[in-house]
Amino acid sequence: VKTQAETLGRPLTFHVTTFGCQMNARDSEKLTGILEQIGYVEEEEENQADFVIYNTCTVRENANQKVYGHLGQLNRVKKKNPHMLIGLCGCMMQEPEVVEKLKKSYRFVDLIFGTHNIFKFAELVATRLESDRMVIDIWKDTDKIVEDLPSERKFSFKSGVNIMFGCNNFCSYCIVPYVR
């Protein structure tokens, strides 16, 4: 990050967009904290950021369609700004068919990871900055719960507190056990 910032003569910027539940909002605070720790500066305008991250939701099909729509718009921005990085994470990335669709039809995306390995985010960013290929790191599940990640709180008066991760009831109508 430091080398690229020196080349550009300014700090690298990022913008995180959160789709979905309170756990995604909490995860986005962690993503923000990690990015700031490695030298990025938050940018309010998505189109101006060097790194755009979508923290996705997949509970409803409409949420998936929103992400695809936003990616179409972001592709046009990236064509004008080829050094821009695009990262996707969250529940939607835990679905194998979504990742296959992204690999095939959205090859301009730079980084894809799921809900179980946010603690590796800085490492994944470094891997992408060192290579010129799409980085995909999806874990089906994990027994690792890393709680001491840097976090940048969006509100001074409230905070998300994870009391559980996902659910293991596997109700026939629910996707949560498969993606969280």
Predicted regions and their residues:
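Proteins enriched for Cys/Gly/acidic motifs involved in redox and nucleic-acid/cofactor modification
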Residues: 1-180
